[in-house]
């Protein structure tokens, strides 16, 4: 897909996200097997340097803390509770996709189970490319669990099987990334399904 249709990024609930996420939610949005699969992917990709966790919360799914972990999200209470975080930033990416960091600040940018909520994902990923060092990775993991009223309509309109290609296309349109890699990490028969899309900063 070279462009997204009109209405793709509309949502059922168009209230500001700062209102929706005002109350902290100390829950995980994946089951234990899917969380373990996210952690295993991070290990396989060697995400041990300076990492930015976009749309983060009280937990980041690293088995071992990276050298530094900057968590960016909407709820300060959740971010403050994240034990691996070395820096915390409250920022609404749907209000402003511009990341408040210098060029080349990070070795990896991760987004776990939140890419479906972005109304300007291509701009956010272009910003991710800007703040990544050459050779760094953008890593998106996602399942079929979500707050459906906050997910964009385009995401809801395509099958689970096609969603990884949507995320890959977001990366292509963002520019500055090598061809994205797509993998289904868990098939969902015994746990939450899990897909991963990652791309290296050129």
Where are these regions (language model features)?
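Core SAM-dependent methyltransferase catalytic element
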Residues: 175-176, 184-202
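A short SAM/SAH-binding and catalytic strip from SAM-dependent methyltransferases
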Residues: 107-122
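A short glycine-rich, Lys/Arg-flanked "PGG" loop and its adjoining helix->strand segment in the class I
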Residues: 122-137
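Class I SAM-dependent methyltransferase Rossmann-like catalytic core
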Residues: 1-46
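Conserved class I S-adenosyl-L-methionine
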Residues: 137-169
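Class I SAM-dependent methyltransferase SAM/SAH-binding core
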Residues: 37-40, 44-99
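A short acidic, Gly/Pro-enriched loop at the edge of an enzyme's catalytic core
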Residues: 96-109
